[in-house]
Amino acid sequence: MKTIDMKYLRLLAKEYPTIAKTATEIINLEAIMNLPKGTEHFLSDVHGEYSAFEQVLRNGSGVVKRKIRDIFGAELDDAEINSLSTLIYYPEEKMDLIASETEDLHAWYRTTLFRLIELCQYVASKYTRSKVRKAMPEDFAYILEELLHENYNEDDKKLYYEEILQHIISLGRAEEFISALSLLIQQLVVDHLHIVGDVYDRGPYPDKIMDTLMNYHSLDFQWGNHDILWMGAASGSRVCAANVIRISARYLNLDILEDSYGISLRPLALFADEVYKDDPCTYFQPKNEENINYSNAEITQIARMHKAISIIQFKLEGEIIKRRKEFDMNHRLLLQFIDYKKGTIQLKGKEYQLLDNHFPTINPENPYELTDAERELIGKITAAFKNCRRLQKHVQFLYSKGSMFLTYNGNLLYHGCIPLHKDGTFMEMKLRGEKYAGRALLEQFEILTREAYVRPTGTKEKKYACDIVWYLWTGAISSLFGKSEMTTFERYFVAEKETHTEEKNPYYKLRNNELICKQILEEFELDGECGHIINGHTPVKEGKGESPIKASGKMLVIDGGFAKAYHKETNLAGYTLLFNSYGLQLVSHQPFTTKEDAIKNETDILSTRQVIEMEINRKRVRDTDIGAKLSEQAEDLKLLLDAYRNGLLHENR
């Protein structure tokens, strides 16, 4: 048994002043540690696709329906199971539909309430009463506790429960009670949620996803490359703000900025209409992946805005590269290699014709210098990001719940990669005069990302940290990017595909190697034999035979594939992961239709479950990180108990 400072024991004695209270708490802790481990749910790369995200979150990647089958599989047919599942996912909307179609609504309420109570009892059985009580809505907490923690099939209790339910129905509270039960079931089937990066990107509703996550009961977040871009913009990085707007313009998603966050793009529109009024901006036409009905005039204006912000972005990136020699990115100083008279560019020793040679704001003698109008414009845009309350609220949440990586219950979670050389050794990067690699590098990236947000505007520390945030978006040794270079300029201006190549970091080949994965796990102080790496960022091309399970199960790639643009490439809507007391299960998902279809026709995302690892002995809370903390608390309390019994401390009755 460990030794402990008497000063600490005296402090502990204030909370547990008697032998009885100390012993009771030890018993409570031991009981909690013997409960089954809660279910962890892993999602990644949501990319603003709110409808599909909401469905997966509400159905727990199929856990809700599986629990229904466990309880009612012999009693209900598939149609009834689908109906009950949909009710739990979307209780209010589904009840509106049922109310308009059901003749004997009283009987439906009664049957449904009994089923939901029985299901809720089942999913609550692995938790303490205290935890279940905290999850209950206040309005129904007492009644729910009565119904959930007794056996209402016993004769002496049956009438009691019948009366409770009868009064709920007769008082017109059945729908509210059904909603409360449904949401409680949703919450109890998943104990903890991991978002392994990229809520943001081209999808239309990252703001709604963030609102949902902010109301979720228990979660953590590993930042993705697109998240870091928005975090940089919210921190006051001009280049990050320019990148965010460019991507939004490219994918016809400016509504997220103007409508969802209230960031006015009128200054950009006025600037673009003036500077590029005679420019067709042919190669900046936005991609209309959703076939949204825009007028020709609107498309023309967005194309001009797209080009205007892109040129500003390239200039700002050049400024950073020139002042940060340690980034080793001089090969990305492209504007100086353009022959503005001939309309050509020198890339890696070869001359290429530019697709577009209209650069009214570029001074060939000083190509990275912003014009006065550009400087004023990007200043207004950056201020709009910094002053947007809703965005700041979302970004603060990302900082409070997020990190560059996470070790959790023996597993390692990160979005992009661990930068490696071809021989499998960790790549080094110099930051503030010191070299870092592996875990230490990611820790420094996280420190600097946080500094970018909190350091005072105008300080050199703020400027450096914001530059690092941009590097994380685009740099060769960034753990979030994972490629040699980002060839954005070439994709706009050069036709030859050879110039568009972005070579992946050796990590992406080496992660198939079990020894490399064990090496990475051990670098993060995890057991290389038992642990797993949970990785997002790269869509798994199942149609081409790629597997999300790599390195004999050590590496699990769960790019959620929510972005519709990747569905043709992946043959799927991606993967999620479940880790419960029985083991690890990878869930592959087919594309989601719509919320309306799910409610009306009771369609669900078709999901296929694959067991990766089955526990011989069911995992208990004591086998988790929380269990380790509880065990330590119990040991401390045992020492306190000994101190009372040996007369070292006196009880305060």
From Swiss-Prot:
UniProt-listed InterPro entries: FBPtase_class3, Metallo-depent_PP-like
GO MF terms held by the record: fructose 1,6-bisphosphate 1-phosphatase activity
Keywords: Carbohydrate metabolism, Hydrolase, Manganese
Protein EC: 3.1.3.11
Enzyme superclass (EC): hydrolase
Pathway this chain belongs to: Carbohydrate biosynthesis; gluconeogenesis
Cofactor: Mn(2+)
Catalytic reactions on record: beta-D-fructose 1,6-bisphosphate + H2O = beta-D-fructose 6-phosphate + phosphate
Gene Ontology biological process terms, A to Z: gluconeogenesis
Top-rank taxon, per record: Bacteria
Pfam families: FBPase_2 (PF06874)
Alphabetized HAMAP family for the sequence: FBPase_class3
Family: Belongs to the FBPase class 3 family.
Record-given protein name: Fructose-1,6-bisphosphatase class 3
